[in-house]
Structures are given as structure tokens and as C-alpha cells.
Amino acid sequence: MRLVDTSAWIEWLIGSPTGEAVTAHLPEQSDWLVPTMVQLELTKWLTREVGEDKTDQVIAFTQLCHVVPLDTEIALAAAEACRVHKLATADAIVFATARVHDAVLITCDAHFDGLPGVTRIEKIKA
């Protein structure tokens, strides 16, 4: 299983050079975990940047993947990730979701560097 962080989603959706690098790491939909936190962040970004039609399309795509709601196990693991790794709450929820589900976290965010189970795609300057 793979969990694609919002940063990697955005790079992929805009078709940036970094997004092209992300493409090589994307799983089949059946192996793609999508935390509800990522759905929230994507909806915020997409609505602001490209409008509701594109937002609806992307969220419909996510619903064909394995959507993972925030539950107590993930919340407690996220609190621990905040404490141990100094992650912001949303990042900790995404990281904890990946860990709880034994998934690889695909991200473009440097603040995940060095964390277990993380594959970071370096941002490519255009």
C-alpha cells in the first residue's frame, strides 16, 4: 500500500516536473490509501486553485481508492508523531495513517525526511 501526501498530489495534478517524478511512485488505485485529511487538504487547495468541477473529479477518484477516516488508533499515533517528530497536526495524521496501515508515504515535503516508511520526491526546480 502507498499513501500519497497532499504535496505529491498537488505536484502530480499540476503536471510539474516534480509531478512527473511522483508518477513513477504512484500505485494502482487498489493499493492507494487516501486519509480523509488528504481529502480535506485537496478539497481546500483544488477549490481555491481550479474550481469545484475539478475538485469533484479528484475527490471522486479518491473514493475509488482506500479512503481511511481518522479513528482513535490513528489519532493516538498522530499525537505520538507530533511529540516525537515535531510534525504539525495534519502531517502527523497523514504519517500516522501510513504507519498504522503499513503503507509507504509518498511526499514532496522535506519535513518528512528521515522518518521511517517515507519516500520523499525531491522538488525539481523548473
Which stretches of residues belong to each language-model region?
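Acidic, PIN/NYN-like endoribonuclease modules and their adjacent C-terminal/linker elements
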Residues: 1, 95, 99-126
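Short, well-structured N-terminal submotif of metal-dependent ribonuclease cores
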Residues: 1-34, 46-59, 126
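A generic structural signal for short hydrophobic patches within well-formed alpha-helices
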Residues: 9-10, 39, 75, 112-113
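Structured helix-beta-strand junction loops
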Residues: 28-29, 61-65, 101
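General small-molecule cofactor/ligand-binding pocket signal
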Residues: 33, 68, 121-122
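Short hydrophobic interaction/assembly module
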Residues: 54-73
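Active-site neighborhoods of divalent-metal-dependent phosphate/nucleic-acid chemistry enzymes
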Residues: 67-108
